[in-house]
Amino acid sequence: ILQVCSIEITFRVLKIKDKVRFDERFGLGSRYKSGEENIFLLDCYNKGLKIYFYNETINIHPKESTGAIWMEEDIYEKGALFRRLYPKMCFFMVLPIAILKRNICKTNIFNITKLLFKGIKDYKKEEDR
């Protein structure tokens, strides 16, 4: 679910119409600029919808990604994303993520950890409103 790009998703509208909606707080043009596809798929799964992966090309696009290099703002937003996806586990994910992603981040592990925790904390405040 975490490795999927929006343009790789197709679905039957009638299956999701009354069950799942995009979380508009996530995605380009919103507060948190990525993660909408991951949230959408996890929400589909949590609502009992079936998710399939087909290793078949259905479209071709230039190799572009919002996840190639994580700047400080991206790291912060990933913290919010992990809080949205895994509310009970997100705190336990911070250190492993900081270690695994340190090579694609434009900062050190201490700052990665701090930014992830800040994203988690700020998103929790939004949830509590």
Regions found by a protein language model. Give the residues of each.
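Non-catalytic, C-terminal membrane-associated alpha-helical segments of glycosyltransferases
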Residues: 68-129
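Hydrophobic residues within well-ordered alpha-helices
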Residues: 43-45
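Conserved nucleotide-sugar donor-binding
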Residues: 5-21
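A conserved hydrophobic position in a structured secondary element of the catalytic/binding core
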Residues: 11, 36, 54
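Acidic donor-binding loop at a coil-to-helix junction in glycosyltransferase catalytic cores
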Residues: 21, 27-39
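Residues that recognize and position ribonucleotide moieties
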Residues: 2, 9, 52
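Active-site donor/metal-binding and catalytic loop motifs
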Residues: 27-32, 49-70, 78-81
